[in-house]
Amino acid sequence: MIYPIALPDRLELLVTLGDEQRQFTVPTPETTLRDEVQHFRELLEKRTTNEYVVPARQLYDQLIRPMEGVLAAHHIDTLVIVPDYTLRTIPFAALHDGRGFLMDRYATAIAPSMHLTDPRPLQATPGTALVLGISKSVQGYVDLPNVATEVTAVHEIEGGDELLNDQFSRARFEAELRRVPYNIVHIASHGQFGNDPSQTFVLAFDGQLTMDDLERDIKFGERRDKALELLILSACETASGDDRAALGLAGVALKAGARSALATLWYISDKAAGELIVDFYRGLQSGTLSKAHALQGAQRALAADPRYAHPAYWAPFLLIGNWL
C-alpha cells in the first residue's frame, strides 16, 4: 500500500508491505507536483497527441521509481494507493517509465482511506446483479446507443435483473434494492461526481439519483446483512477541477457499505467503456482474478485495440475500495 504525501518542500512516499514499512523522500515541492499533475491530466485527455508521455514519465520518476527495488524484492503485482488530495485527479495506471505504462506491470486500486477498505475477496453469488442503463436521450442528455449492448452483455454474464431506459426509474431502483440483496449493482448512464452534492448524481429515466438517494438505498441492502460487493458506474464523469470528485459517488457507496466501486475520472466513448466493462466481468467470472487484476486485464485488452490504444480511453477507470 502506498501513501504519497505532498508537503510544501518535498514529497514523502510511505510504503506498507505486510508488516514492513518503508519511507522515501523526493525533493519535489507541493506546488511543482500540483502543476505537473494538472499538466498530465490535461494532456492525457487529448486523444490526438502523445504529449502526455513527458509528464507521465516525470510523475513516474517521483511517485514509483524510488520504490522500484522494494516492490521487485517483494514480488508485488498490485499497488493500492491512498492518494494525497493533489493526486486524486489522475490515473496512476497511465504513469510511464520510459518503456511502458504502470498498467503493464501492476494492477492498481485506490483506497480513499484504510478505514473505508475491506480487503476480502469478492463473495460471488450467481444471479444477484442489478444491471441498469439509459441508452435513450432523456432530460436534455444525449443518447448512449452502446449502453443497451453493454447492459445486455453484462446481464448475460452475471445474470440477475436488467432494467433499461424507462424501466430504470428512481422508484424502481429503490424498490429493487429493497427487494433483492444484490451482489453487484451496475449503472450505465450519464452521471457526474463532484464535491458539491448538487453536482453529484446518476441519471435515471425520470430524474437524478443523488448521493443521498444512492447512500440510502445501498444502506438498506446492508441492513439486510447483505452488503453490496461491487458498484459500477459506467459512462459517468467527474466535475472538472474537483480534487475529490473521483471519489464522489464511489466514496458514498463505500461509506454506505459497498465494498468496492468502479468509476471513471472522465467521460469516454460508451462503446469503449462497454468493451472494457464486459472484459472486466469476464475476468471476474474466471474465478482466478482479483478485481484489480480483472481491471488490469480489461485495460490491457482495450489498449491493444488500435482504436483505443491512447490512455484517454482505458486509463480513467478507477477501482476504489476492496481490490481483491
Identify the meaning behind each predicted range.
Residues 13, 79-81, 90, 132, ...:
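Residue-level detector of buried hydrophobic side-chain packing
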Residues 1-105, 117, 126:
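Domain-scale, conserved, charged regions that form catalytic cores
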Residues 5, 82-85, 132-136, 187-190, ...:
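Active-site-proximal beta-strand/loop segments in catalytic clefts of secreted hydrolases
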Residues 1-7, 11-16, 21, 110-113, ...:
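Preference for extracellular/luminal or secreted protein segments
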Residues 112-115, 119, 183-279:
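Catalytic cores of nucleophile-dependent amide-cleaving enzymes
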Residues 76, 273-324:
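An often Trp-containing, charged/polar helix-loop segment at the C-terminal end
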Residues 18-19, 36, 74-75, 82-184, ...:
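Catalytic-core domains of enzymes
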